[in-house]
């Protein structure tokens, strides 16, 4: 987690941390069709960012949850989208269009608020070295999830990859 947090702190300007996490949650959830899966994947990184900045932990987690719900609401592969379109006998494209008119304006307003809130954020000036090998499990989990792989298989692969890398780098114990 620390490697991914350090990578995020290096890539994103301080004032865009909140907006960046929100956009990432929106995109991931929209791509994989599950808000819960997105929350599970991003919350550890968000917690790490909150610990290294002055961002309140509950607020940072709320940013992840809000973005996750946005994407899940619009995703074509979300279980609720599939169930609702089948039971209501409507076309997914129509549901997407109508939901977009509702949630996209709200997301734009929220994004503006996060950008404004981010103006007061300062990250530590000394960012630890990024251990690139420890970022690999996140890339694999996000990549396989976005590719549409079964959620349980994605989680198993993520756990195994993390375990192997953790043992290889001596990160356990």
Q: How would you label these PLM feature ranges?
A:
Residues 23-35, 66-72, 143-149:
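Transmembrane alpha-helix interface/packing and boundary motifs in multi-pass membrane proteins
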Residues 66-69, 73-128, 133:
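Juxtamembrane and boundary regions of transmembrane helices in multi-pass small-molecule transporters
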Residues 23, 27, 104, 108-112, ...:
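Generic alpha-helical transmembrane segments of integral inner-membrane proteins
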Residues 34, 38, 84, 115-123, ...:
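Transmembrane helix-loop junctions in multipass membrane proteins, especially transporters and channels
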Residues 1-50, 173:
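Membrane-embedded alpha-helical segments and adjacent helix-loop junctions characteristic
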Residues 1-16, 126-127, 139-173:
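Hydrophobic transmembrane alpha-helices of multi-pass solute/ion transporters
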Residues 22-26, 44-45, 64-69, 99-104, ...:
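Transmembrane helix-bundle signature of multi-pass membrane transporters/permeases
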Residues 15-27, 54-71:
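Alpha-helical transmembrane segments of multi-pass membrane proteins
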């Amino acid at each position: 987690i620390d490697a991914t947090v350090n990578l995020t702190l290096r890539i994103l300007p301080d004032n865009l941390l909140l907006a960046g996490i929100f956009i990432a949650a929106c995109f991931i959830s929209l791509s994989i069709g599950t808000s819960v899966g997105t929350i599970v994947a991003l919350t550890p990184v968000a917690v790490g960012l909150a610990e290294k900045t002055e961002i309140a932990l509950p607020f940072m987690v709320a940013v992840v949850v809000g973005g996750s719900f946005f994407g899940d609401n619009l995703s074509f592969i979300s279980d609720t989208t599939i169930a609702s379109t089948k039971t209501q006998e409507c076309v997914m494209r129509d549901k997407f269009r109508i939901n977009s008119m509702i949630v996209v304006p709200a997301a734009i307003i929220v994004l503006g608020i996060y950008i404004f809130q981010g103006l007061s954020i300062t990250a530590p000036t000394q960012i630890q070295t990024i251990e690139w090998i420890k970022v690999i499990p996140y890339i694999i989990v996000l990549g396989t999830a976005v590719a549409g792989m079964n959620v349980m298989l994605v989680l198993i692969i993520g756990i195994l990859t993390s375990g192997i890398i953790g043992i290889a780098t001596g990160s356990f114990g």
